[in-house]
Amino acid sequence: TIQQERQRNGMPISNLSYHCAFIGSPGTGKTTVARILAKAYKLLGIITNGDLIEVGRSDLVSAYLGQTAIKTNELVDKSIGNVLFIDEAYSLFERKDDSYGKEAIDTLITRMENDRNNLVIILAGYEKEMTDFLSTNPGMMSRINRYIHFQPEGM
């Protein structure tokens, strides 16, 4: 990756991450752009594989107490070197007492920090829901460097 090359050449390593939020209505091209971005990041050496792994809440959250972190970590492990695209990311935290969703979010926040040199996570969803989700989650918000807004065609 770029960071590894910088390190090999004795250059300082930046704490830059490429995690981002795609915000917009259905059909505005969020998934298509994420696929293109995954390939571009591979070509740039930011990630090693360049595949887009598309997931939702059910892929990250378990039905059993204590199993969500395991499930989320296993999915992130499989996503190393790729872009992990979490559609309707706000659904991870549906209610204030949603301990399963909170466990998934806490696990993702840790992995976004620890694996940022070979993993890109894109959180996607509708504008109002994503704004609410990110504003109640300072840890998640601090790891997102780019907010890309997708407008319906003709707007």
What are these regions (language model features)?
Residues 76-78, 104-119:
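Substrate-engagement module of ASCE P-loop NTPases
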Residues 135-152:
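A short helix-turn-beta junction within AAA+ P-loop NTPase domains corresponding to the substrate/partner-engaging
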